[in-house]
From Swiss-Prot:
Family named by the database record: Belongs to the glycosyl hydrolase 16 family. XTH group 2 subfamily.
Any Gene Ontology CC annotation: apoplast
Name of the gene this protein is made from: XTH13
Binding of xyloglucan, residues: E104, H117, T118, N119, N127, R128, E129, D193, W194, G198, R272
UniProt organism field: Arabidopsis thaliana
Protein name: Putative xyloglucan endotransglucosylase/hydrolase protein 13
Catalytic residues of the enzyme: E100 (nucleophile), E104 (proton donor)
Amino acid sequence: MAAFTTKQSLLLLSLLLLISLSAGSFYDNFDITWGNGRANIVESGQLLTCTLDKISGSGFQSKKEYLFGKIDMKMKLVAGNSAGTVTAYYLSSKGETWDEIDFEFLGNVTGQPYVLHTNVFTGGKGNREMQFYLWFDPTADFHTYTVLWNPLNIIFLVDGIPIRVFKNNEANGVAYPKSQPMKIYSSLWEADDWATQGGKVKTDWTNAPFSASYKSFNDVDCCSRTSLLNWVTCNANSNSWMWTTLNSNQYGQMKWVQDDYMIYNYCTDFKRFPQGLPTECNLN
């Protein structure tokens, strides 16, 4: 194999640096907010870990607020017996009428699958849960979890595959998050009163500390701000994400996920809504 020239080596170094910068440093983008040392940023800002023990969990939040965007995070979840643990990754605004977009990963006993719990809150109202099993082991390696939020819809994606869409149906009286900036939050915590098999399986603290890892954060395609008056450019030259909806191929992918891996859908829970399903269920 031919040796690299100096020019080639510099080009390769520049490319690697660009890849590193595009992934986003956790030092630059996030603050650890709780856990008393149980959350740590390592590997020169490229990896963040959250841990949970019997005393406390841990968590972090973004420095920026976002009003629409395509946000990626690679995550590797708690391995082994993770029963009773919840790894939450979500966007949320503040106040009593907050908006929120949720990924929550509910742990399970060894050999049993995680449950991916999703929800959308508008004006402080949620009750829009959809739950899934994953088609891979989320503890064996990192996988990418994406929220694409624009004026038209909110799309939840796993490794680029859409699993759920919440459309803007304001014209039909359904509230839609479009005016309240949100921060990104994530935490690892214990909720064994409900998280695993409805609370039947409790956390086995002999397996603690539990740990989840994060890397390759990407918020390049976003409208964001770092202060009330400091809005960052919304990448006007590359903002195809701002008007993205699912194409026919992506609808096919989502149908595959929902047919084969969905385990709960609020839009089919007639017992929960005896007076009639939420309006959007008949529109989406």
